[in-house]
């Protein structure tokens, strides 16, 4: 076989559409929570592919599941069903409130399906009913949310920087203030078909919802016959120390969307709901070519079975505290964080006023010392590592973060 031609970081700028600005190194290999670049430099991974690699890189059981299914059948199309998709659906149903599942390929697709379902259910059940003033097709979302990059989901996201250049945008979407129940109550009416919310706003700064806020949304949706949609793309599949974050709050949604960690690095998305609401979608009303393919579902089934274990989920909560304790020590030395927030292994370090706007600079500096981390806006350094990252890796990774912080501090104070 012919050897592949050499590529460099410059190749990205030459050949790819510039929708991203990746780091100046190229990762070529990963094992557990360690990555290596083309030059052989190692990095501890606190990013996890943005909350995707929940079991790290190259987990032997996940790899085995991929190889086993690859030797059978990869793809069939939606004219046929397959064993892995049926088994994965049953796993999700047994583990959650759901009774029905729709599989797709990404979080954006899952949210698109959820919003379409909400409008279709409202059309079927409330159109032209006595006492109904106006069409029941309005969607309430929240500012600084992130629900994907399709035109529908990016409009729901409530971040103009992602949507303002693509007008005209889909209508009928209204944005309230996250964690402000009065704001939501003002927007949710009998014309509302759905409320979509993240239990923790990830891209919006790792901001957890208040328990009272989510319970209040549940009550408002019940009062106005609107579907409550929980976007758990980033918080799902063990990320917060429960299989799904709604389980912390004692409130169940009508629809839940999942992706990212569900495949452990293999693309897959899912929309979970009840029989009552799923009945709104009939044959041909929605679909996707690759959704529910046997290769993705075989991998996801293994990932889910490994993560949905009491010991592993308890370990996520323990690791959260390890992070918090080490970060407190870093902050005692450098005084850069105003707040550390999040749940489980979705953690946001909010920079104080002196270091406002420098999250990207800190992450880039830390990479020089061998740490891969994330940002959640200009003022928040974000971590979403493997759920089974070791105590040693946490300690070493945060030591590398501290070196990056010290480098930035010297610039700020000099």
UniProtKB/Swiss-Prot annotation:
Reactions listed under catalytic activity: N(2)-succinyl-L-ornithine + 2-oxoglutarate = N-succinyl-L-glutamate 5-semialdehyde + L-glutamate
Keyword annotations from UniProtKB, A to Z: Aminotransferase, Arginine metabolism, Pyridoxal phosphate, Transferase
Source organism superkingdom: Bacteria
Top enzyme class: transferase
Pathway given in the UniProt record: Amino-acid degradation; L-arginine degradation via AST pathway; L-glutamate and succinate from L-arginine: step 3/5
GO molecular function annotation: identical protein binding; pyridoxal phosphate binding; succinylornithine transaminase activity
Endpoints of the signal sequence: none
Residues that bear N6-(pyridoxal phosphate)lysine: 260
Function: Catalyzes the transamination of N(2)-succinylornithine and alpha-ketoglutarate into N(2)-succinylglutamate semialdehyde and glutamate. Can also act as an acetylornithine aminotransferase.
Listed name of the protein: Succinylornithine transaminase
Natural source organism: Yersinia pseudotuberculosis serotype I (strain IP32953)
Lineage, opening ranks: Bacteria, Pseudomonadati, Pseudomonadota, Gammaproteobacteria, Enterobacterales
Gene responsible for this protein: astC
